[in-house]
Amino acid sequence: MADKADWQQPGLLHRAFDAAVTGDPYPVRAYISMRHNILSSLPDPDTLRSKLDKLDLIVAITTTWSPTADYADIVLPLSPALSRESILASKLGLKPQFFRRQRAVQPRFDTRADWEILCGLASRLGLDKLAFSRIEDIWNYQLEGTGLGIEAFDATGFVPLAPAPRWKTLAEATLPTPSGKIEARSRLWAASGHDTLPPYTAPERPAAPDQFRVIPGRAALHTQASTTNNPLLSELAPTNTLWIHTERSQALGIADGDWVEVCTATGPVGRLRAKVTTGIHPEAVFMLHGFGRKTPQETRAFGKGVADEACMVSGLEHEDPLGGGLALQKHFVTIRKAEETN
């Protein structure tokens, strides 16, 4: 870890905001978000906001409005992908390569490329070695010692680093474990007090006839939570619906297309239309991620659907002790039929 924190603090973002509250392992005073809408991508945004309130400064570098941008102290407008160059990047695999992205159209509305924003900040902070004024200078700096010039990218935009794909033989195909193989039970984790193959424990089940496990998901039309306000995509997928099993919906008096209200233990979350189907487990309901926006600048997405992350009360506490990931399908909601609205 660059910050010298040990394996108990393995660079997990949701833990960083705990440090803003507790000061452990060190105080965190500012957060600079680069195209990351944290208030939609992590569970329980209300609890997360209470932690963000402890910070002195929040900066959002973004191409679009979002709950995080609206909450930030400063918003730095980022040029969209086609309007910005990027630093050289690498692609791994059987035939690794360097690649370059160039600007296709001129930026609008005084937006800037990511490198322009970061180099501008470096200049203001007196970090002259990082204060590049031209993307070409960054590219040449990156290529120092490689034997390549930037003209090598002119033909196709990428430079292969191997003449052909390199396949490993079975004898070479080992894993970075003590045995070199897949280990169902890890001795390394066991030595640190973690059982990697514990006895099976049945998951918690709904406790009432109107209670369901809520499952979030994605759609091919949208990218995470970043495109629901897009003028074209919002026409094709303007809101989300609540998938609910046919038998459970009948017991609750809910028909396909009815308005339903979603509630957690802390109260109502929002309303959306029901999609009655046999294609879901009877104990679960499903909704697409990225909706239920309350940011007034997002005029197309504002007030449409329900935010799945708002259904995940205490979700920042449900962490896998080994991998560190948050459990997003561990939460329950209650569903009831709602009155029709004009």
Label each PLM-derived region with a short phrase.
Residues P25, L94-Q97, T196-P209, V276, ...:
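Short flexible/disordered coil segments
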Residues M1-D70, P80-L88, T156-L252:
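Extended redox/cofactor-interaction regions of prokaryotic respiratory oxidoreductases
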Residues L82-P107, I117-A122:
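Glycine/threonine-rich phosphate-binding loop and adjacent beta-strand/alpha-helix elements that clamp
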Residues D24-P25, K91-G93, A265-V269:
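Short, charged helix-to-loop "capping" segments that act as catalytic/coupling loops
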Residues L78, L94-Q97, R101, G147-L148, ...:
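Alpha-helix boundary/capping detector
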Residues D73:
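Catalytic, metal-anchored helix/loop core of enzyme active sites in primary metabolism
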Residues L76-P77, D308:
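Catalytic alpha/beta core of large soluble enzyme barrels
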